Swiss-Prot record:
One annotated GO biological process: translation
UniProt KW keywords: Ribonucleoprotein, Ribosomal protein, RNA-binding, rRNA-binding, tRNA-binding
NCBIfam families in the cross-refs: rpsG_bact
Protein purpose: One of the primary rRNA binding proteins, it binds directly to 16S rRNA where it nucleates assembly of the head domain of the 30S subunit. Is located at the subunit interface close to the decoding center, probably blocks exit of the E-site tRNA.
Pfam families cross-referenced by the UniProt entry: Ribosomal_S7
Highest taxon listed in the record's lineage: Bacteria
UniProt protein name: Small ribosomal subunit protein uS7
The encoding gene: rpsG
Family: Belongs to the universal ribosomal protein uS7 family.
GO terms, molecular function: rRNA binding; structural constituent of ribosome; tRNA binding
UniProt keyword tRNA-binding present: yes
Complex and partners: Part of the 30S ribosomal subunit. Contacts proteins S9 and S11.
InterPro entries: Ribosomal_uS7, Ribosomal_uS7_bac/org-type, Ribosomal_uS7_CS, Ribosomal_uS7_dom, Ribosomal_uS7_dom_sf
Amino acid sequence: MPRKGPAPKRPLVNDPVYGSQLVTQLVNKVLLQGKKSLAERIVYGALEQARDKTGTDPVITLKRALDNVKPALEVRSRRVGGATYQVPVEVRPDRSTTLALRWLVGYSRQRREKTMIERLANEILDASNGLGASVKRREDTHKMAEANRAFAHYRW
């Protein structure tokens, strides 16, 4: 355990194109091996495709997608007397946003479209419509929490 306490959160700069911190976080999640300009090209291309398909502001579409993917509950392992229980706990708002972005990017990488721009755009559009693998992941997480509701009194 560190004696100094948790490391302070560094402030996120707003995205230069859309002026949104969410887009900055999405770029950082898409980022691989330090290639930030490539990650920005992918995210901006995906948001442009989303704008072309919906005709609305892509940041609003992204926010709607994130609202459909953000988990409210998750299960965490807790060891009690030799047995490990899956204890349902509420998810903090910053963690739920991080999880939602991680799931969006992760499941867009598994899609079958040809380019990453198409995959990310279609996953964002599916999530904003309540479809897609990332929304299913959220529902599965909530089902796990509901199934283990009996262990909620072990919450810490």
